[in-house]
Curated annotation (Swiss-Prot):
Pfam families: PRC_RimM, RimM. InterPro entries: PRC_barrel-like_sf (IPR011033), PRC_RimM (IPR056792), RimM (IPR011961), RimM_N (IPR002676), RimM_N_sf (IPR036976), Transl_B-barrel_sf (IPR009000). Its main location: cytoplasm. GO terms for cellular component: cytoplasm; ribosome. An accessory protein needed during the final step in the assembly of 30S ribosomal subunit, possibly for assembly of the head region. Essential for efficient processing of 16S rRNA. May be needed both before and after RbfA during the maturation of 16S rRNA. It has affinity for free ribosomal 30S subunits but not for 70S ribosomes. The keyword Cell wall biogenesis/degradation does not apply. Binds ribosomal protein uS19. GO terms for molecular function: ribosome binding. It is found in: Cytoplasm. This is Ribosome maturation factor RimM. It comes from the Bacteria. The PRC barrel domain binds ribosomal protein uS19.
Length: 172
């Protein structure tokens, strides 16, 4: 499949931040909007470094700025604490399709970036969140940081062609 929108890719959607209570519930920071959507993605793959394990979500709910979740086979506080720091990943195919003109960051990584004059600036290696707008980290002959502002700097995104066209001077 062209581009990086393959449905077999893992996407980080949260992180286990610790235990909740004494019965094995875990507390997780959700990167989804709204945060409780994290509970609906099943199964999870928990990953920390080279360690990886499947986690079946039995139930969960929002709790303050986080979510609390009961996972199959995690029955004690000690078992839940052992999962602290694990990333929560799901398959890309589990995510709902983005609205028109919106993109998942994971789908932008790997796309070729060219300017209006067809000069290749490089490839998107990361997307940083800065508050005001996301920033594309583009690696070519050097690293460039390009604001992801559609209609201003970003003129088009074509996932099928693995290409982003930007209004950007290659000297910058």
């Amino acid at each position: 499949m062209p581009g990086n929108s393959g449905n077999d890719r893992s996407v980080v959607v949260g992180r286990v931040s610790g235990a909740f209570g004494v019965r094995g519930w875990v507390k997780a920071v959700s990167f989804t909007d709204p945060p409780v959507n994290l509970v609906g993605y099943r199964p999870w793959t928990l990953r920390r470094g080279d360690a990886e394990r499947r986690a079946d979500v039995l139930e969960g709910r929002e709790h303050g700025n986080a979510v609390i979740v009961r996972l199959q086979g995690v029955d004690t506080r000690e078992q839940a604490e052992a999962l602290k720091g694990f990333e929560v990943t799901v398959r890309r195919s589990q995510l709902p399709p983005p609205a028109p003109g919106e993109y998942y960051r994971v789908d932008l990584v790997g796309l070729k970036v060219v300017n209006l004059g067809e000069t290749v600036l490089g490839e998107v290696v990361d997307v940083m969140e800065t508050g005001a707008n996301d920033v594309l980290v583009v690696q070519g002959d050097r690293e460039r940081l390009l604001p992801f502002v559609q209609g201003v700097f970003v003129k088009s995104v074509n996932l099928e062609e693995s290409r982003i066209v930007v209004d950007w001077d290659p000297g910058f």
